[in-house]
Amino acid sequence: MSTDSLPRSLMEQKAMELQQQLQALLDEIDQNKQESENISRESEYLCQYIGSMMAFQNRQTVPKK
């Protein structure tokens, strides 16, 4: 269907709906980005924690001469 045959009010309504959908998608992208950054920080912290625990465990298991 050509846009020439649509009434102006219907085209404006469609444009508004599309703009709202776009804004919702942009908001979701921002939220996902924030969650991803949080997960990255948590993963980094866990890796550091595990590394320090492994180092501590290795110190405990080294035989004394």
From Swiss-Prot:
Residues 8-44 form a coiled coil. Belongs to the SLO1 family. InterPro entries: SCOC. It comes from Schizosaccharomyces pombe (strain 972 / ATCC 24843). This is SCOCO-like protein 1. Keywords: Coiled coil. GO terms for biological process: vesicle-mediated transport. One of its GO terms (cellular component) is cytoplasm.
